Structures are given as C-alpha cells and as structure tokens.
Amino acid sequence: MQRYELIRLIGKGGMGEVYLAHDKACSRRVALKRIREDLSGNALLRQRFLREAKIAADLIHPGIVPVYSICSDGEAVYYTMPYIEGFSLKSLLKSVWQKEVLSKELEEKTSVKSFLPIFDKICATVEYIHSKGVLHRDLKPDNILLGLFGEVVIIDWGAAIFKHAKELKLEQDDEAAVSFDERNICYSSMTIPGKIVGTPDYMAPESLLGVEASEKTDIYALGLILYQMLTLAFPYRRKKGRKLSYRDVVLPPIEMSPYREIPPSLSQIAMKAIAINPADRFSSIQELRQALQPYLQGDPEWTVKATLMAKEKSCWKYYDPILLSRYFPVLASSPAQWYNFMLSEVEISASTRVEYTVTKSAVHEGMGILFLPSKEAERGEFYCGYGLWFSVQNHELTVSLIKNGIEIQKKSQEMISQQSRFAILIEKSDNRIAVFVEQALFILHIDYLPSLGNRLGVIIQDLQGMSNIAISESIGALRVSCLAVPDAFLSEKLYDQAAIFYRKIRDSFPGRKESYEAQFRLGVTLLTQIEEQGGDLTQALSSFDYLHGGAGAPLEYLGKALVYQRNGSFVEEIRCLLFALKRYSQHPEIPRLEDHLCFRLYDSLHKHRSEALVFMLLILWIAPEKISVREEERFLRIIYHKQQATLFCQVDKAPLQFRSSKMELFLSFWTGFSLFLPELFRRAGGLRDYQALADIFYVAGVSGNREAFMQFSTALANVSDEITFPESLHNQKVAELMFFVKGVEALRNKDYQKAKKLLWKTPFTLQLYALDMFHIQAFLDEEIESFIDLLQAIYDPASEEERDHILVYIIQTHLWNRDLERAYKLLNDRFPLDEELAEYSEAFILWGCYLALTGDRVVVKAHFSRCRYKYGKSALIGKCVDGDIFDYLDNLVWWEKKMTLFQSYFLLRCLNESPRRYEKYRQAYLSMENNFFD
C-alpha cells in the first residue's frame, strides 16, 4: 500500500473498511476499501472480499462506482475506486427521524416527489445488475450513496454474487423447500459475516429461513427502501434481536404516515414489493419500475367519484330511446335501430376515468360512450365532443373514436372466441384520450386542445349486458398543470376569464413550455370566442404571432392553420401546416401537427372530399405510420373511381399500393399538389424506374405545370449518358424519354411534323401520354386536324389492346366533327347504353355529348340525372345544360375541376350553344391554376 496515503476512515461494513486516501502516483483522492484486520485471516471472507471487487469491476453503470485497481498480494487485500463526495441515504433518512418540524430545505429533500426519482435510479442500477446475472443481496439505505451533484450509486458489493454460482450453494444451510406462513423471524440491522449473507433487517423472510437468494430477495429490500422513503419510518418497531410475527406488524405506508399524503396505489406498490410470499411480489425490477412510471411522470391518482347503474334512472339526467343516426351518423350500423340513451346527472372533471365491463352480445349491434360539453348537452346537441363506438362482429372487436360526429380513428382486433365479457377502461385527461380493453391499450388520441366534454353519455341496446359504470377522478398527481384553471374556464366557455389566466401563465414562465402552451391556448380561446360571438376570424392571427421564433414556434403555424380552416381559406391553411412541418421537422411539438393532419383528413372525408386527398397526401409523405392497414383499405375504396379514371393507372395494370411513390404521384395529380414532384422524380431516377419517370413527366405536363416539366427535362438531360435502364423495364433508354420530352415541347410549339418524328421513336405508353396531353389543347384551340393526324399516326401501328386506350379520343373527334354515325357505332359497340356504365367513366360523358348532338335536351338531362353523386363531376357536367355550374366546383378535387370545365365546354359545343356560353368554360379552364398554390 505504499502508493496510497490513508487520510481518514469514512465507512465501515461487515467485512471491510473504507478510507479516503491519496493516490501518490496519480496525485488524486480515491476511496480505498480493505478487508478488516480481524477478518483478514478468514480464507472464505478473503475470497468473498476479492469477489466483491471483481464483480464491481465487471459492472459498468452510472449507478455503480468503478474500480480503479485491485490488490491481493501478501497480507494486503484492498481495492480502490473514485471518491464521491456525498452522504448515504440512511443519513438523510436519519436526519428527519423523530423530528416534528422540518426545515423547508429538509422537507423538500425528503418529500415523496424528491425521493421517487432517487428510488428509480436505484432500481435502474439493480435492473442492470440483474441483467448481468448478479444479485446484490445487501441493498439498504446505508449502501446507497447520494452524491453532491445528483449521483445515486450503490456501494458495498461484499454480498453480491452471480446467480447459480457454486458459492451460493455453499452459503445455504438447507436446500429444502420452506413454507412462509407465520414464521417467527429474527431481525438485525448489521451485516453478519459468515453463513447468513446480508443485513437481516433488509433480508426477505425466505432468505432468513435459508432459501436461495433470487431477484425477488433484492426486490424485497428495494420495497423496504421505498417504504422508508414514503413514510420516513421503518416498518418494524422492536428491539434488536427480538422475534416478531411479520404479518401482524407491517402497516401500509398510507396508514403508517397519513400526514405524508401518499397516493394509495403508491402505498400498494411498496406493500407488494415486501409481500411475505415471493410469488406475491413484483416478478422483476422492470415491472416494479413500470408501476412507478405514472408517479414519476406526474400522472394522476384516481378515486371513485360516482357509480352509475345502467338501469337506475335516478343516475341519469336524460334517459330515453333514440335513433342511432342522430349521434353516430357515420357508422355502418343501421340508423333505423333504436337504442337506449342515457346522459349522466353527475358532471365529470377534466381528468376522468370510466370503467365498466360489457358482454360480447351487448355490443353485437354496437354501444357508444360520449363525452359531451354541458351546454350543448343541455340543448340536446349530443353530437358535439368526443365519442367512442364499440362493436363486435365475427369475434372481432372494433373501436371507433368520434369527434363532433366525425370518425377520426378506428381500430379492430380479434378476440378470444370463448371470451363472453371484457373490461373497458377509458381515460380522458387534458388533451388525451386513451382506451384500454382488458388492460391493453387499444386507442390513444392526443388533441391540440383539452377535451371539453364534462357529461357522460351512454348508447346501448342491451342494458342487461353492461355492468355498473365507475367514474373516477384524479386526486393524487405529483404535479398538476398550471393550465388546469384556465382550461376549466374554457370548458365552460368563460372566454374572458380563461384569457386572463392564460396571459398570466404566459408571462410567469418565460421561455418554458407552460408559457408557449398558454399563449397557444389563448389564441384558440380568442378564435373560438370570435367564431361564436361573430366577427372577423383573422383578428385571432395576431395572438399566434407571439409564438414566432420561440420555443413553441410550430404552434404559431398550427394556430394560424386553425384560423384559416375556420375562415374557409384552405390553401392558406395548407401553407401554414407545410411551413411548420418542413421548418421544424425535428421539433418535439411536431407530433401535435401530425395528429391535427389526421383529424383534418377524417373531418374532410365527411365534409369536403376535395380537401381529403390533400391531407391524405400530406400524411403519406410526413407521417405514414398514422394510417393503419385497415384504414388503407378504406382509403383505397374511396379513391377507386379516380384510380379507374387515371391514365397512368390504366396503363400499369399492377394494383395501386397505398404506401408507395405511385400513390403519392396519384394524389399529387388529382390535387394539383406539385410540391413533392421533385422528390418523387429524384427517387425514381435513383431507382432507375423508367415507368415512374414517365408517369411524373405525364403528371407535370397534363396538369399544365410547365416549370416542373422543364426542370425535370433539364435534370434528365444531365444524366442521359449515365443511366441505362435494366432489362426488366423493357430495356428502354433515357434517350426514348428525351424524345418524348422534346416531342411534347414540339406539340406545345405547334411544330406537329417534328413532334410526330420524335414520338415515333418512343414506346406506345409515351405516345399515349403525349396524345392525352395534346388532345385538350387541340380542342380548346380548335386545331382538330393536327390532333387527328397525330392520332392516326399512333393508332395505325398499335396493337388491338393498345388501340383500346385510343378509342375515346377517336370518338371525341367524331363528335366534334358531327360524324354521328361513326360516333354511335363505336359507342354502341364498345360501351352500350343498355349496360351499366360507371358515371365516372369517360364513355358516360361521351354518350351525353352524343345525345346532345341529336338535339334532344330532355334526353341529355335524363342521361345525366342517372348520376348517384349529385355534385360529382358527371352530374355537374349535366347541370351545365340549363345553367352555370361554377358555384358547385368547390366540391371537386383540383383535377376534377379542370376536367369538368373542359368537358362542359365540349358538351356545350355539341349542343350548339352560343359562343358566349361555352367560351366562359373555355376561359375558366385556361385561367385555372396550373397547380395547387398558384
């Protein structure tokens, strides 16, 4: 030990002594632990001491002091480690024992709130050593060191051992099985060197009776430490060495120290950890830590506020039969069915838990749970707020989350076929709703504002199948949001009072989340107030300017998007959301914007289908994980007709996959949303995907986005010598694509002979794309002969299958030239009227144009009146016979608007309408934006 100079003794344990020492070689202070002189001759204890050092040296964790060196030469047996300034957990607990009044500092240090993070760090360290196969076997406050700078470390590894080690077997007196019922056990607070390893006060009952140590014996010791942290007292009150009956003396922490305001379930956690029977304890440290997480995160403690009996009318303010469609109009259940509707007499708080069980048969036709704002509920407006719809079909449970009558989330899961009843738990807290079925999380939804529902409603057919409903509210959260007060005012629509408190919170916490959250909610409060009381909604924009460039910057744009949404400025709404998502992509508040996008998608599906495809595209691009597989199937059904009417989907027979670049291109095409086209082009080029590149050129060209078309042409020319597409893509070369690009430019410049020569060198798909781009321009400019010439040049060498794609253009030219005989023959042969024609098909429109040329306007109107979708594209084209349709165009997607204008122009020409009428549609088409934002 010549290298070390001992300064002073700083600790003494069962086997060793710890000194503060000076390391002369490194010129630093270290902690030196050596075996006690009176035990140095004991070979077993000497071996255990060295094992302690080696175990500590093998473990690397912030909660374990690393070992610098180990010495076992001659009589000197010691090891060194860093010296950590601090104090033991025992000394902190001892400082408050038997004190009636604590200083403010000591009260804060020993509060439940302060102790729990320390305990979690201790558990994290023990969880780590268990993962390495090590048991500590002597966990106690004396062996927990609290550093001056926040360190929490476990010391004294003298009793530690690897599980299943031979030494563990040698230390046991008896390997026989032991029963734990009513044993008299002797306790002591000192580690006993010898056969019994550990400190009896902190040893599990089975360890004192000679049973092999395990993870659960360490869990027991941790439970005692937690008990002391909660109560500031030890669970046993007896003299040293006295025998006592364990089961008779341990009081739950909540009873031991009622003044400490210990949440009941936290008290139960401690009692479970120190259960007399190991089987009743936590199965692992991980399970113990998971049980503590709600308290570490400040989640609430729940207490039952009311119990509602489904068949007891006195529990309900409103109890009547209703038709389902009034409350859940979007659901598949028959709206003609009658259900029992109950509205709770008791009001529920902002943080509420609803628990009940229900039979499978009771929800066969569905049941609903509603969270309704009081004022709306009083007026009978039961469709406001949030609702949940549960249904079981074919052993599959489906849960739908409804907001203001709109289904915004849906999840299904198979159930155990024999299961006849299941437990449901719903937690509504602040801006969060969580649904648990059989203790498993089923749905989680986070809104951008607190949920305002404070009445509980129930819709069900079979009252016999539903248990009583327990309504609990939070009482024991370790932290309560300062926003709770203004949120309560907002829920009651006391806007002025809410605004006052939001401003106070904003000014009281500068630079913190509470500040920007308060400002955001202030903005939404003002917006809601203006909307309800009347006024200019854009006045609320300035309240969100306060968030600009600060910690909550994305919320500025979310708030402004809300203003534009309610003001009907869809393009500006999208601009705001895109700006925030692009500029602050890594910001922790971005998930709130993603959730808002999801809500807007589902909302627009029921209100503005023209907007829904834009939100679908944004979610696919930014947060595809938000859409479940079942929702994918639903969305594919919604866009099926548009897929059938899309040329590049007709050419490629492969099914359109929802999560694919082609779907993103499809949505970009229909919405005119060209922002993502450059990235799609780059992606397709990187994959050497010839067909995808051709599709992107087509979308840019047919939508009139000349800037994007030329940008892609330049990019393609720059790599034309570097890329050759593989054999699997028909061995097409970049040169062919360049011929196509130049051919389209020649058509645009009306150099038709050059265009024909260039397009002759391209495959049929590219010729078809060029033809489709040119045909609208030709009809609008009334240059039909040039179009017919190009059409014939492409038609003649084409195969029969390829000619089918060209047929509609041929019919159009016959109709334009009043060649009714040829037009009728082609229409009747290929698309006979006696067959059911899809109204979204091009043939349906062409039949309408043919009937218009026969001169019978009544027949034309009758033809278009067959449309099921009264404000769909085909129906609107029919409406132009008697009047203008411009006021209806907002119901259509961007590309539908363009095609409706063109086909209305074409129909009016066929009807021999005055130039003044059809010219309006021609000019409207030409003046329409080339893309979403122009």
Curated annotation (Swiss-Prot):
Enzyme class at the top of the EC tree: transferase
Gene3D superfamilies: Phosphorylase Kinase, domain 1 (3.30.200.20), Tetratricopeptide repeat domain (1.25.40.10), Transferase(Phosphotransferase) domain 1 (1.10.510.10)
Transmembrane regions: none
Disulfide partners: none
The reaction(s) this protein catalyses: L-seryl-[protein] + ATP = O-phospho-L-seryl-[protein] + ADP + H(+); L-threonyl-[protein] + ATP = O-phospho-L-threonyl-[protein] + ADP + H(+)
Processing after translation: Autophosphorylated on serine and threonine residues.
Keyword line: ATP-binding, Kinase, Nucleotide-binding, Phosphoprotein, Serine/threonine-protein kinase, Transferase
Catalytic residue positions: 138 (proton acceptor)
Subunit structure: Interacts with Pkn1.
Similarity comment text for this entry: Belongs to the protein kinase superfamily. Ser/Thr protein kinase family.
HAMAP family for the chain: PknD_kinase (MF_01957)
Name this protein carries in UniProt: Serine/threonine-protein kinase PknD
Gene source species: Chlamydia trachomatis serovar D (strain ATCC VR-885 / DSM 19411 / UW-3/Cx)
Organismal lineage: Bacteria, Pseudomonadati, Chlamydiota, Chlamydiia, Chlamydiales
Name of the gene: pknD
